[in-house]
Amino acid sequence: MTNIGGPVVENASIEHPVISEEEGAAAFARVMAQLKAQVGIEAYTSWFGRLKLAEYSRNLVKLSVPTAFLRSWINNHYGSLLTNLWKQENSAILRVEVIVRGMKRVSKGVVCRTSAAPVVLEGQTASSFVESYTEPSVKDIEAGVFGSPLDSRYTFESFVEGSSNRVALAAARSIAEGHKSALRFNPLFIHASVGLGKTHLLQAVAAAALKRLMPARVIYLTAEYFMWRFATAIRDNAALSFKEQLRDIDLLIIDDMQFLQGKSIQNEFCHLLNMLLDSAKQVVVAADRPPAELESLDLRVRSRLQGGVALEIEVPDYEMRLKMLRQRLKVVQQDDNMVVISDEVLQYIAKTVLGSGRDIEGAFNQLLFRQSFESDLSLERIDELLGHLTRSGESKRIRIEEIQRAVARHYNVSKQDLLSNRRTRTVVKPRQVAMYLAKMLTPRSLPEIGRRFGGRDHTTVLHAVRKIEDLVCDDQTLAKELELLKRLIGEQAA
């Protein structure tokens, strides 16, 4: 028997007669009580709150969680503990396995997704089991995605629509539904700060495309996973096969494009991108900034990405934040109808937590956790608990790109004007104001700011900063403009 922080496996060929549902539920409750006592309520709520019993036999226990990340974390950090607790409950147990809900095991398929197993092509026999993304409504589709795992929660149905993401959502739906008009904005490039729904939207496209395309040739990858797979293929002398698999697809979805590094890898990606686009195959890409600002990317890649349509997802407004909270509560109440949070409290959170969807989710989870042992939470207590996420909390880090966008909007010029060599007064003043604010509001050095403004020298930035400092002493209109811009930028970064 071997156990290194993960599930125990002993003699997988042994029969596993299934125990009754009532016995299983009782055993699961006892083991979970023991687990909570050993790890503490906070760790239990964080890591095991969504754990469910999927199967219980004489020798085997299968537990399910909603995400691959949660499965990996539990296996790596609590695998031995879980196995020992189940053995204490039933000494005949040989294996405790954690699986992801909504996935099934297959031995062959068209293209299957896996984080470690090899790609399986139609007609081949898998050398080991791999996981294929499925949902009950599409469980008979023998298709899938190889690459980064899909989270079954990330669908169009669960995506909260609002004014800040409506255009990006419409474009994503058009691609997922296979509209011919979608090729007019190919590639589709979605950019936003962290926690605003880029990954959710991209995975929703992949999930919907898998339902529609039979067989599906869909690949969803993070940029980091693409780099790892490519490096592994080179190491194993399988680079040619890897490239062929990537080229024989209908839809390529790349997340976190800002992390694509390395000259040779970027060169390969450029060839892949050119080939797919020239073949009228759809490409969807997401990053934390527009293509022109991905300075680490090869110029050819940036140019090709700019040839499609770039859409920004912005910070959610009050109505959208409230909608997200109401939907989150509805989902929780489906599992536990005893959970009650008043709409007044949800409205209060939506008004005070001004950040990303991830901040909203964090605020809701914090409230849900606290409510389990503080039944009557006042608004003052909620303020105290969520202080790190509200207006009174620490301000978020401001990016130069956010300053450039705000200044460009205010002075009715384009961002490209700010980066250009144009010397007209209508452009010079906004450019100097933006450089000044970049120096005041960010920790960036003068050379770095200069690079972000079209590759200018640091002395140009220094001149702009001093110029604005001199003007603001005598120009009350400019002083008010600067205060307004600081407030707008602060709200945008909140």
UniProtKB/Swiss-Prot annotation:
Quick one: where's region Domain I, interacts with DnaA modulators? 1-103
Query: Could you tell me the keywords of this UniProt record?
Result: ATP-binding, Cytoplasm, DNA replication, DNA-binding, Lipid-binding, Nucleotide-binding
Annotated binding of ATP, by residue:
195, 197-199
Q: Which GO terms describe its molecular function?
A: ATP binding; ATP hydrolysis activity; DNA replication origin binding; lipid binding
Q: Which InterPro entries match?
A: AAA+_ATPase, Chromosome_initiator_DnaA, Chromosome_initiator_DnaA-like, Chromosome_initiator_DnaA_CS, DnaA_C, DnaA_dom, DnaA_N_dom, DnaA_N_sf
Report any one BP term from Gene Ontology. DNA replication initiation
Chain segments carrying region Domain III, AAA+ region = 149-371
**Which segments carry the region annotation Domain II?**
103-148
Q: Report residue spans for region: Domain IV, binds dsDNA.
A: 372-494
Q: Which PROSITE patterns match?
A: DNAA (PS01008)
Q: What does this protein do?
A: Plays an essential role in the initiation and regulation of chromosomal replication. ATP-DnaA binds to the origin of replication (oriC) to initiate formation of the DNA replication initiation complex once per cell cycle. Binds the DnaA box (a 9 base pair repeat at the origin) and separates the double-stranded (ds)DNA. Forms a right-handed helical filament on oriC DNA; dsDNA binds to the exterior of the filament while single-stranded (ss)DNA is stabiized in the filament's interior.
Q: Please report which protein family the annotation says this sequence is part of.
A: Belongs to the DnaA family.
Q: What is this protein called?
A: Chromosomal replication initiator protein DnaA
Species this chain originates from: Bartonella quintana (strain Toulouse)
